Amino acid sequence: MGTTTFSGPVVSNNGFTSTSIAFDDLPTASDSTGRIIFVNDALKASETAGNGTGNLVFSDGSNWIRVDTGANAGK
């Protein structure tokens, strides 16, 4: 995967596209610090275990964190 470094704000008039992956296929959080991924079966705040419909998560180097609540990601 290629990387690009920016020195200022990043602006898109057409949105951004994120990688999509299943929760069980996430790489280890410790190997992915700073990565942002859409997990297609991760839980949202209103969903129950096993019924996740997707959430954006990021790695803090220890855990995958849900962007909607700041809690550890789950499915």
In which residue ranges do the predicted regions lie?
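Beta-propeller fold detector
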Residues: 66-70
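Extracellular/surface-exposed low-complexity repeats and stalk/linker segments enriched in Gly/Pro
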Residues: 11-49, 71-75
